[in-house]
Protein backbone atom coordinates (compact mmCIF):
# COMPACT_ATOMS: atom_id res chain seq x y z
CA UNK A 1 0.00 0.00 0.00
CA UNK A 2 1.38 3.42 -0.97
CA UNK A 3 2.08 5.43 2.17
CA UNK A 4 0.35 8.74 1.41
CA UNK A 5 -0.09 11.18 4.28
CA UNK A 6 -3.61 9.92 5.00
CA UNK A 7 -2.40 6.31 4.89
CA UNK A 8 0.47 7.19 7.23
CA UNK A 9 -2.03 8.67 9.65
CA UNK A 10 -4.23 5.59 9.45
CA UNK A 11 -1.25 3.27 9.90
CA UNK A 12 -0.26 5.04 13.13
CA UNK A 13 -3.73 4.33 14.51
CA UNK A 14 -3.48 0.57 13.96
CA UNK A 15 -2.31 -1.50 16.95
CA UNK A 16 -1.47 -5.17 16.35
CA UNK A 17 -2.05 -7.47 19.33
CA UNK A 18 0.85 -9.86 19.88
CA UNK A 19 -1.38 -12.45 21.57
CA UNK A 20 -0.13 -15.74 20.19
CA UNK A 21 1.72 -18.87 21.18
CA UNK A 22 5.27 -19.87 20.32
CA UNK A 23 8.63 -18.63 21.46
CA UNK A 24 10.21 -15.19 21.39
CA UNK A 25 11.52 -15.78 17.86
CA UNK A 26 7.99 -16.59 16.69
CA UNK A 27 6.57 -13.39 18.20
CA UNK A 28 9.40 -11.29 16.78
CA UNK A 29 8.83 -12.78 13.33
CA UNK A 30 5.37 -11.19 13.44
CA UNK A 31 6.88 -7.87 14.49
CA UNK A 32 9.37 -7.91 11.62
CA UNK A 33 6.67 -9.03 9.20
CA UNK A 34 4.21 -6.26 10.12
CA UNK A 35 6.60 -3.40 10.94
CA UNK A 36 5.73 -0.61 8.55
CA UNK A 37 2.19 -1.96 8.14
CA UNK A 38 0.92 -1.27 11.67
CA UNK A 39 1.73 1.64 13.96
CA UNK A 40 2.00 0.00 17.39
CA UNK A 41 2.50 -3.50 18.78
CA UNK A 42 0.46 -4.48 21.83
CA UNK A 43 2.26 -6.58 24.44
CA UNK A 44 -0.30 -8.14 26.76
CA UNK A 45 -0.22 -10.43 29.76
CA UNK A 46 0.40 -13.57 27.71
CA UNK A 47 3.51 -12.28 25.96
CA UNK A 48 4.90 -10.21 28.84
CA UNK A 49 4.59 -13.07 31.33
CA UNK A 50 6.56 -15.34 29.02
CA UNK A 51 9.17 -12.95 27.65
CA UNK A 52 9.24 -9.93 29.97
CA UNK A 53 10.94 -6.62 29.19
CA UNK A 54 13.17 -8.33 26.62
CA UNK A 55 10.21 -8.48 24.22
CA UNK A 56 9.48 -4.77 24.63
CA UNK A 57 13.11 -3.90 23.98
CA UNK A 58 13.30 -6.20 20.95
CA UNK A 59 10.24 -4.55 19.41
CA UNK A 60 11.66 -1.09 20.04
CA UNK A 61 14.91 -2.09 18.34
CA UNK A 62 12.92 -2.47 15.10
CA UNK A 63 11.86 1.17 15.42
CA UNK A 64 8.31 0.25 16.42
CA UNK A 65 6.21 1.57 19.29
CA UNK A 66 4.78 -0.55 22.12
CA UNK A 67 1.44 -0.53 23.93
CA UNK A 68 2.01 -2.31 27.27
CA UNK A 69 -1.39 -3.86 27.93
CA UNK A 70 -1.04 -5.18 31.49
CA UNK A 71 -4.17 -3.49 32.92
CA UNK A 72 -2.60 -2.58 36.26
CA UNK A 73 -5.13 -2.90 39.10
CA UNK A 74 -3.85 -2.82 42.68
CA UNK A 75 -3.38 -0.43 45.58
CA UNK A 76 -2.26 3.06 44.47
CA UNK A 77 1.39 2.76 45.51
CA UNK A 78 1.87 -0.58 43.76
CA UNK A 79 0.34 0.61 40.49
CA UNK A 80 2.30 3.87 40.60
CA UNK A 81 5.59 1.96 40.97
CA UNK A 82 4.65 -0.41 38.15
CA UNK A 83 3.80 2.60 35.98
CA UNK A 84 7.24 4.06 36.65
CA UNK A 85 8.67 0.81 35.30
CA UNK A 86 6.60 1.25 32.15
CA UNK A 87 8.08 4.73 31.71
CA UNK A 88 11.60 3.34 32.07
CA UNK A 89 10.81 0.74 29.41
CA UNK A 90 9.99 3.58 27.03
CA UNK A 91 6.56 2.29 26.00
CA UNK A 92 4.31 4.61 24.00
CA UNK A 93 1.24 3.76 26.06
CA UNK A 94 0.09 1.55 28.92
CA UNK A 95 -3.14 0.99 30.81
CA UNK A 96 -4.67 0.69 34.25
CA UNK A 97 -8.11 -0.50 35.33
CA UNK A 98 -10.30 2.55 35.98
CA UNK A 99 -12.16 0.45 38.55
CA UNK A 100 -8.99 0.72 40.64
CA UNK A 101 -10.35 4.10 41.71
CA UNK A 102 -9.51 7.77 41.65
CA UNK A 103 -6.58 7.61 44.09
CA UNK A 104 -4.90 4.83 42.13
CA UNK A 105 -5.21 6.75 38.87
CA UNK A 106 -4.14 10.17 40.18
CA UNK A 107 -1.12 8.75 42.00
CA UNK A 108 -0.13 6.89 38.83
CA UNK A 109 -0.32 10.05 36.73
CA UNK A 110 1.81 12.02 39.18
CA UNK A 111 4.42 9.26 39.45
CA UNK A 112 4.66 8.91 35.67
CA UNK A 113 5.10 12.67 35.20
CA UNK A 114 7.88 12.76 37.80
CA UNK A 115 9.67 9.71 36.40
CA UNK A 116 9.48 10.95 32.81
CA UNK A 117 10.78 14.36 33.83
CA UNK A 118 13.56 12.99 36.01
CA UNK A 119 14.80 10.55 33.34
CA UNK A 120 14.11 12.97 30.46
CA UNK A 121 11.91 10.34 28.80
CA UNK A 122 8.77 10.86 26.69
CA UNK A 123 5.50 10.89 28.60
CA UNK A 124 3.52 7.79 27.59
CA UNK A 125 -0.22 7.79 27.10
CA UNK A 126 -1.92 6.47 30.26
CA UNK A 127 -5.20 4.75 29.44
CA UNK A 128 -8.00 3.65 31.72
CA UNK A 129 -9.64 0.31 31.01
CA UNK A 130 -13.41 0.78 31.32
CA UNK A 131 -15.41 -2.42 30.75
CA UNK A 132 -13.84 -5.41 29.00
CA UNK A 133 -15.34 -6.06 25.57
CA UNK A 134 -16.01 -9.67 26.62
CA UNK A 135 -18.64 -8.42 29.12
CA UNK A 136 -22.25 -7.47 28.44
CA UNK A 137 -25.13 -6.20 30.60
CA UNK A 138 -25.97 -9.68 31.87
CA UNK A 139 -22.37 -10.22 32.96
CA UNK A 140 -22.40 -6.93 34.90
CA UNK A 141 -25.60 -7.93 36.68
CA UNK A 142 -23.97 -11.16 37.80
CA UNK A 143 -21.10 -9.08 39.19
CA UNK A 144 -23.54 -6.99 41.23
CA UNK A 145 -23.75 -3.87 39.05
CA UNK A 146 -27.19 -2.34 38.55
CA UNK A 147 -26.18 -0.18 35.58
CA UNK A 148 -25.71 -1.07 31.93
CA UNK A 149 -22.29 -1.51 30.33
CA UNK A 150 -22.73 1.83 28.56
CA UNK A 151 -23.53 3.65 31.80
CA UNK A 152 -20.57 2.12 33.61
CA UNK A 153 -18.20 2.86 30.73
CA UNK A 154 -19.22 6.52 30.71
CA UNK A 155 -18.88 6.84 34.48
CA UNK A 156 -15.39 5.31 34.40
CA UNK A 157 -14.32 7.43 31.41
CA UNK A 158 -15.28 10.63 33.22
CA UNK A 159 -13.43 9.45 36.33
CA UNK A 160 -10.32 8.65 34.27
CA UNK A 161 -10.40 12.10 32.70
CA UNK A 162 -10.81 13.76 36.09
CA UNK A 163 -7.81 11.76 37.34
CA UNK A 164 -5.65 13.13 34.52
CA UNK A 165 -5.40 10.03 32.35
CA UNK A 166 -4.75 10.51 28.62
CA UNK A 167 -7.78 8.49 27.62
CA UNK A 168 -9.53 5.14 27.91
CA UNK A 169 -9.82 1.72 26.35
CA UNK A 170 -13.45 1.20 25.36
CA UNK A 171 -15.71 -0.63 22.92
CA UNK A 172 -16.50 1.14 19.68
CA UNK A 173 -20.16 1.08 20.66
CA UNK A 174 -19.33 3.43 23.55
CA UNK A 175 -17.11 5.83 21.61
CA UNK A 176 -19.71 8.42 20.66
CA UNK A 177 -20.96 8.81 24.24
CA UNK A 178 -17.40 9.08 25.58
CA UNK A 179 -16.45 11.63 22.94
CA UNK A 180 -19.50 13.75 23.76
CA UNK A 181 -18.78 13.59 27.50
CA UNK A 182 -14.99 13.93 27.47
CA UNK A 183 -14.21 16.07 24.42
CA UNK A 184 -12.13 15.77 21.27
CA UNK A 185 -8.70 15.59 22.95
CA UNK A 186 -9.48 12.57 25.13
CA UNK A 187 -7.81 9.50 23.58
CA UNK A 188 -10.01 6.48 22.88
CA UNK A 189 -8.41 3.10 22.13
CA UNK A 190 -10.83 0.49 20.83
CA UNK A 191 -10.38 -3.30 20.98
CA UNK A 192 -12.87 -5.81 19.63
CA UNK A 193 -12.32 -4.71 16.03
CA UNK A 194 -13.23 -7.23 13.37
CA UNK A 195 -13.19 -7.41 9.61
CA UNK A 196 -16.37 -7.81 7.61
CA UNK A 197 -16.34 -11.52 8.51
CA UNK A 198 -16.23 -12.53 12.17
CA UNK A 199 -13.32 -14.68 13.37
CA UNK A 200 -14.03 -18.27 14.42
CA UNK A 201 -13.93 -18.71 18.20
CA UNK A 202 -14.58 -15.01 18.79
CA UNK A 203 -15.06 -14.29 22.53
CA UNK A 204 -15.61 -10.55 22.30
CA UNK A 205 -19.23 -9.42 22.38
CA UNK A 206 -19.20 -5.67 21.69
CA UNK A 207 -17.44 -5.44 18.32
CA UNK A 208 -17.53 -3.27 15.19
CA UNK A 209 -15.59 -2.88 11.95
CA UNK A 210 -12.56 -0.60 11.79
CA UNK A 211 -14.21 1.94 9.52
CA UNK A 212 -17.26 2.30 11.75
CA UNK A 213 -15.16 2.56 14.93
CA UNK A 214 -13.04 5.39 13.50
CA UNK A 215 -16.09 7.14 12.10
CA UNK A 216 -17.56 7.12 15.61
CA UNK A 217 -14.40 8.71 16.99
CA UNK A 218 -11.87 6.02 17.98
CA UNK A 219 -8.25 7.23 17.94
CA UNK A 220 -6.50 3.84 17.95
CA UNK A 221 -7.77 0.37 17.04
CA UNK A 222 -6.47 -2.88 18.54
CA UNK A 223 -6.60 -5.73 16.02
CA UNK A 224 -5.17 -9.20 16.49
CA UNK A 225 -6.87 -12.33 15.21
CA UNK A 226 -8.34 -10.85 12.00
CA UNK A 227 -4.79 -10.05 10.86
CA UNK A 228 -3.04 -13.03 12.41
CA UNK A 229 -5.42 -15.63 10.94
CA UNK A 230 -5.67 -14.02 7.51
CA UNK A 231 -4.28 -15.85 4.49
CA UNK A 232 -2.04 -12.82 3.88
CA UNK A 233 -1.54 -10.93 7.19
CA UNK A 234 0.31 -8.02 5.57
CA UNK A 235 -2.47 -7.51 3.05
CA UNK A 236 -5.02 -7.75 5.88
CA UNK A 237 -3.18 -5.05 7.85
CA UNK A 238 -3.12 -2.84 4.76
CA UNK A 239 -6.85 -3.44 4.28
CA UNK A 240 -7.50 -2.31 7.84
CA UNK A 241 -5.43 0.83 7.21
CA UNK A 242 -7.65 1.58 4.24
CA UNK A 243 -10.74 1.04 6.39
CA UNK A 244 -9.32 3.45 8.97
CA UNK A 245 -8.62 6.01 6.25
CA UNK A 246 -12.22 5.75 5.05
CA UNK A 247 -13.44 6.22 8.59
CA UNK A 248 -11.28 9.32 9.04
CA UNK A 249 -12.56 10.77 5.78
CA UNK A 250 -16.16 10.23 6.89
CA UNK A 251 -15.81 12.11 10.18
Swiss-Prot record:
PROSITE patterns: OMPDECASE. Its EC number is 4.1.1.23. Pathway: Pyrimidine metabolism; UMP biosynthesis via de novo pathway; UMP from orotate: step 2/2. One of its GO terms (biological process) is 'de novo' UMP biosynthetic process. InterPro entries: Aldolase_TIM, OMPdecase, OMPdecase_AS, OMPdecase_bac, OMPdeCOase_dom, RibuloseP-bd_barrel. It catalyses: orotidine 5'-phosphate + H(+) = UMP + CO2. Belongs to the OMP decarboxylase family. Type 1 subfamily. HAMAP family: OMPdecase_type1_B. This is Orotidine 5'-phosphate decarboxylase. The gene is pyrF.
Amino acid sequence: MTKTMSNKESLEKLIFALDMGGGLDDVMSWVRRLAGHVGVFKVGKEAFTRFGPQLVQSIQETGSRVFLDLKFHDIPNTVARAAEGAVELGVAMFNVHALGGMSMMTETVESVKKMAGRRELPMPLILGVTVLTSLNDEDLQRLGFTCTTGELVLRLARMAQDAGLSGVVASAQDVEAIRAACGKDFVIVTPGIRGLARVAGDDQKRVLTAEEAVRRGSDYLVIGRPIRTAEDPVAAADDFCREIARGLSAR
